[in-house]
Amino acid sequence: MPLLDGPRNGETVTASAHNGIPIIDGVDPSTLRGDIDQDPNRRQKIVVVGLGMVAVAFIEKLVKLDSERRKYDIVVIGEEPHIAYNRVGLSSYFEHRKIEDLYLNPKEWYGSFKDRSFDYYLNTRVTDVFPQHKTVKTSTGDIVSYDILVLATGSDAVLPTSTPGHDAKGIFVYRTISDLERLMEFAANHKGQTGVTVGGGLLGLEAAKAMTDLEDFGSVKLIDRNKWVLARQLDGDAGSLVTKKIRDLGLEVLHEKRVAKIHTDDDNNVTGILFEDGQELDCCCICFAIGIRPRDELGGSTGIQCAKRGGFVIDESLRTSVNDIYAIGECASWENQTFGIIAPGIEMADVLSFNLTNPDKEPKRFNRPDLSTKLKLLGVDVASFGDFFADRDGPKFLPGQRPSAESIGAADPNREEEPQVKALTYRDPFGGVYKKYLFTMDGKYLLGGMMIGDTKDYVKLNQMVKSQKPLEVPPSEFILGAQSGGEENADDLDDSTQICSCHNVTKGDVVESVKSGTCKTIADVKSCTKAGTGCGGCMPLVQSIFNKTMLDMGQEVSNNLCVHIPYSRADLYNVIAIRQLRTFDDVMKSAGKCPDSLGCEICKPAIASILSSLFNPHLMDKEYHELQETNDRFLANIQRNGTFSVVPRVPGGEITADKLIAIGQVAKKYNLYCKITGGQRIDMFGARKQDLLDIWTELVDAGMESGHAYAKSLRTVKSCVGTTWCRFGVGDSVGMAIRLEQRYKSIRAPHKFKGAVSGCVRECAEAQNKDFGLIATEKGFNIFVGGNGGAKPRHSELLAKDVPPEEVIPILDRYVIFYIRTADKLQRTARWLESLPGGIEYLKDVVLNDKLGIAAEMERQMQELVDSYFCEWTETVRNPKRRKYFQQFANTDETVENVEIVKEREQVRPTYWPKDGANEDFKGHQWSSLSWQPVIKADYFSDGPPAISSANIKRGDTQLAIFKVKGKYYATQQMCPHKRTFVLSDGLIGDDDNGKYWVSCPYHKRNFELNGEQAGRCQNDEAMNIATFPVEEREDGWIYMKLPPVEELDSVLGTEKWKVKKGEAVDPFEAYDKKYSGMKGKRAGAKGIEGSKPTRSPSNTIDW
């Protein structure tokens, strides 16, 4: 078995290799070899020390090249507790905090090898190597034999141990996940203070970005001993431009500073820095990113030669000074150089894997590596390629000749040499672009260069340097051509061009993976070739090559909605509109690939949205209800514990006291958590499904309507008070906001959209980050469109100026309808506007100038939608037939709590989700016995259409989901293991061409198969599965399930066992509350603090 967590305490852990070669604990290594070499048929064992990016690259390449001969078994020993992760993308960890997102391969990959040919240790260090016995010893005491040993131990971050205070609390390095987690924990406890990064190289800028992304420090400063950042890659002009761009982003950079001493307090906490020039800087945290030191400690006693500057000495075949021991990556010293970037390590892995698997062929040689880099650092595009310092240091090589000693200025220091290189430089101070290309004196050869701000020609130019071919165009065209726009294009690149330097992937590799049929999607290409899985900077080119290759093969690069619909969302909208298709079945018969397909979790909501945008049916009507996502299905947003939120509409944020009181009475009666939203209305959380009808009955009776907080439709139109109250107001923002919200409420779109109206340029309503926003002027309103907040914020753009109030509606009608007609699935207006050819100018032509001649038609369509408005909740509460949809269980009126509720700040909320889900093998569980048991009457389920209906039933303490799909029944557990949520019966059902059905969890779209040999398997997360049960309808009118005894069923799937309870998850504020406990104000405010009291009780109040 592969070891995922290393050895457990008190146990001897072994990892068996093929043919019985053991890993033995506590045995004299001299006795280990024994008769191992006497078996001529055995596979050789390669032991890899280290499990980093280079080690994994070597293993992947070796396995691929050895797939036919099967000559080798592999054991890899990793020192970190994690499987191999992407160290190049380390800074992204601060954004998602998920180590799994950095894994180079999923955990399943490590267990996918046949014949036990691959084993691995984690959290285990190799402490000794015994070359004479061909064994290594680990930190757990295990002795591991090898035939070939590959050292891929990497490097350590350098810490200035000679600097006083280097061991203080608050000193960090930037190298591993553990380093980042310690830094994150420290930063969280020192909010608002100053953090410092020391080092202005590649790693230093990454560390500075990481500290900035934490958002805990009040300020972050970058300390660099050089005159400009990236001094090893850039000249002074380029480095100074990068420094300026970084400063413009708010990061303070201090150049020509060397740390002399680190100041500390009596508890050895960092308090500041003393520089060698006598200046001082106050700070609480210092992250050193000043270089790396090769991990070569295994060299000393083993006889493996190490270089003076560190690293195992290797030759051009990657051999060390000891037979059958090789070194690759940052721990290897080639010609007294070590390399701290990934590309040379990948090249080493390529050379060694080829030579080990092709002994009969001419061996590959490791030559001077390409140290070119292309990165995005702190939002700045930076690239250097080829011999980028040839003008400063003299050329390392001149095409067609070898430079003499004189030519590189080494023969006679007193002789004034003629230059061997000419530089062509381009500067654009307005666009922040700098380019310097270095040519031979005759301009026939490109030697190298550097780029800032615009790096799209990097791959093409780097290949020109590598090819050493005479140029076909004059040097001037490199600059003139660079000024033209356009995306990265791979059409004119040779197949030998390296596209991905992180993993040494060429254009030909990508092309071949597609042409061979191995890769049919861009995700397949990334998985197969590893292109784009390092720093990710090559992805535009990889996408371009993939698209071009697919087109060359006659394959269309699809933007189809999904596998069931051969149209884009915009095309499908037009098909449905022109053919007047009014149901899902009509759409599938007219526009689907298979007329009787069930669709899937992608096309069903998209088609439902289009039907609503065109015809506005009630979502709970029989033919539409099954198409809806869970939110639309129950007209409310589902929350973490399976309850829902209730949001009445508050147009423009204006509400009467009576309606506020009604909301308060409802919230108190049903014990709902209340919160004011960013859209100026009140959200009530924690409503049980079975209470939604009663809650909305009371709200409707109080004169309120659905706020559509659950829908991909208009949410709110926010407003400031404008001229209604404000002394600075220029226009009536409240009046306009209410009119707009009342006009566009309930209208479905490809995604949610929001509006705002500000009464003057002070912009209190934040209209310029909304899908549409208005700002009052003396002449009317300026209309802005295409903005949003969210994960990728975007300021809106000005569509029209000084529009009179009566002319606002036609403009917005056209804008919204054009968006509904042409946007892609789940595309916000910001991304839609960016994708329009010509952007805002094109939109102006369509909306304002009627370029397409459809303005009147779009206004008419909007008016029809506005006239068709009805409140969905008002209609629902008046229809008693819909009550059955709002039961928790279909077979009983009982109710259960799915997540433990806690009280906080005088309100209730569900306890936090734990980090891990329920990863037990429910699918493979062996029940002691199964018997047929009646569970629910068959008439609960629809005979169709629609072709699908479902129910959640309760058996003992266990919740079970039953699905009726095209007349057949399927049954599973109700709990989705991912977050232990009891919701599967509310999930959308999908199918494929092979008749395979799946249910998609409403929360995070884990898809579980319902039928076939793999029933219960999760299609998109192999770490989890669900239990399935036989189920059938019988002549007595009941549905029967084949179930184990109730007690046994509850012991495996019971709600009480799996519902999330308080204490399972880490309290995010535990450290904060511990640190700041007891800090209370001296006046009124918090409960329990004596404060001012009203002089008299207000009348006509409710009991809050």
From Swiss-Prot:
<feature type="binding site">
    <location>
        <position position="535"/>
    </location>
    <ligand>
        <name>[2Fe-2S] cluster 1</name>
    </ligand>
</feature>
<feature type="binding site">
    <location>
        <position position="764"/>
    </location>
    <ligand>
        <name>[4Fe-4S] cluster</name>
    </ligand>
</feature>
<feature type="binding site">
    <location>
        <position position="1004"/>
    </location>
    <ligand>
        <name>[2Fe-2S] cluster 2</name>
    </ligand>
</feature>
<keyword id="KW-0411">Iron-sulfur</keyword>
<keyword id="KW-0274">FAD</keyword>
<dbReference type="GO" id="GO:0046872">
    <property type="term" value="F:metal ion binding"/>
</dbReference>
<keyword id="KW-0004">4Fe-4S</keyword>
<keyword id="KW-0534">Nitrate assimilation</keyword>
<comment type="pathway">
    <text>Nitrogen metabolism; nitrate reduction (assimilation).</text>
</comment>
<dbReference type="GO" id="GO:0020037">
    <property type="term" value="F:heme binding"/>
</dbReference>
<feature type="binding site">
    <location>
        <position position="720"/>
    </location>
    <ligand>
        <name>[4Fe-4S] cluster</name>
    </ligand>
</feature>
<feature type="binding site">
    <location>
        <position position="538"/>
    </location>
    <ligand>
        <name>[2Fe-2S] cluster 1</name>
    </ligand>
</feature>
<dbReference type="Pfam" id="PF03460">
    <property type="entry name" value="NIR_SIR_ferr"/>
</dbReference>
<feature type="binding site">
    <location>
        <position position="500"/>
    </location>
    <ligand>
        <name>[2Fe-2S] cluster 1</name>
    </ligand>
</feature>
<comment type="similarity">
    <text>Belongs to the nitrite and sulfite reductase 4Fe-4S domain family.</text>
</comment>
<feature type="binding site">
    <location>
        <position position="976"/>
    </location>
    <ligand>
        <name>[2Fe-2S] cluster 2</name>
    </ligand>
</feature>
<feature type="binding site">
    <location>
        <position position="760"/>
    </location>
    <ligand>
        <name>[4Fe-4S] cluster</name>
    </ligand>
</feature>
<feature type="region of interest" description="Disordered">
    <location>
        <begin position="396"/>
        <end position="419"/>
    </location>
</feature>
<feature type="binding site" description="axial binding residue">
    <location>
        <position position="764"/>
    </location>
    <ligand>
        <name>siroheme</name>
    </ligand>
</feature>
<keyword id="KW-0001">2Fe-2S</keyword>
<protein>
    <recommendedName>
        <fullName>Nitrite reductase [NAD(P)H]</fullName>
        <ecNumber>1.7.1.4</ecNumber>
    </recommendedName>
</protein>
<dbReference type="InterPro" id="IPR012748">
    <property type="entry name" value="Rieske-like_NirD"/>
</dbReference>
<dbReference type="InterPro" id="IPR041854">
    <property type="entry name" value="BFD-like_2Fe2S-bd_dom_sf"/>
</dbReference>
<dbReference type="InterPro" id="IPR052034">
    <property type="entry name" value="NasD-like"/>
</dbReference>
<dbReference type="InterPro" id="IPR006067">
    <property type="entry name" value="NO2/SO3_Rdtase_4Fe4S_dom"/>
</dbReference>
<feature type="domain" description="Rieske">
    <location>
        <begin position="932"/>
        <end position="1040"/>
    </location>
</feature>
<feature type="binding site">
    <location>
        <begin position="44"/>
        <end position="79"/>
    </location>
    <ligand>
        <name>FAD</name>
    </ligand>
</feature>
<keyword id="KW-0285">Flavoprotein</keyword>
<feature type="binding site">
    <location>
        <position position="502"/>
    </location>
    <ligand>
        <name>[2Fe-2S] cluster 1</name>
    </ligand>
</feature>
<dbReference type="Pfam" id="PF04324">
    <property type="entry name" value="Fer2_BFD"/>
</dbReference>
<dbReference type="GO" id="GO:0008942">
    <property type="term" value="F:nitrite reductase [NAD(P)H] activity"/>
</dbReference>
<keyword id="KW-0560">Oxidoreductase</keyword>
<dbReference type="InterPro" id="IPR017941">
    <property type="entry name" value="Rieske_2Fe-2S"/>
</dbReference>
<feature type="binding site">
    <location>
        <position position="1001"/>
    </location>
    <ligand>
        <name>[2Fe-2S] cluster 2</name>
    </ligand>
</feature>
<keyword id="KW-0521">NADP</keyword>
<dbReference type="InterPro" id="IPR005117">
    <property type="entry name" value="NiRdtase/SiRdtase_haem-b_fer"/>
</dbReference>
<dbReference type="Pfam" id="PF07992">
    <property type="entry name" value="Pyr_redox_2"/>
</dbReference>
<feature type="binding site">
    <location>
        <position position="726"/>
    </location>
    <ligand>
        <name>[4Fe-4S] cluster</name>
    </ligand>
</feature>
<dbReference type="InterPro" id="IPR023753">
    <property type="entry name" value="FAD/NAD-binding_dom"/>
</dbReference>
<feature type="compositionally biased region" description="Polar residues">
    <location>
        <begin position="1094"/>
        <end position="1104"/>
    </location>
</feature>
<keyword id="KW-0408">Iron</keyword>
<dbReference type="GO" id="GO:0051539">
    <property type="term" value="F:4 iron, 4 sulfur cluster binding"/>
</dbReference>
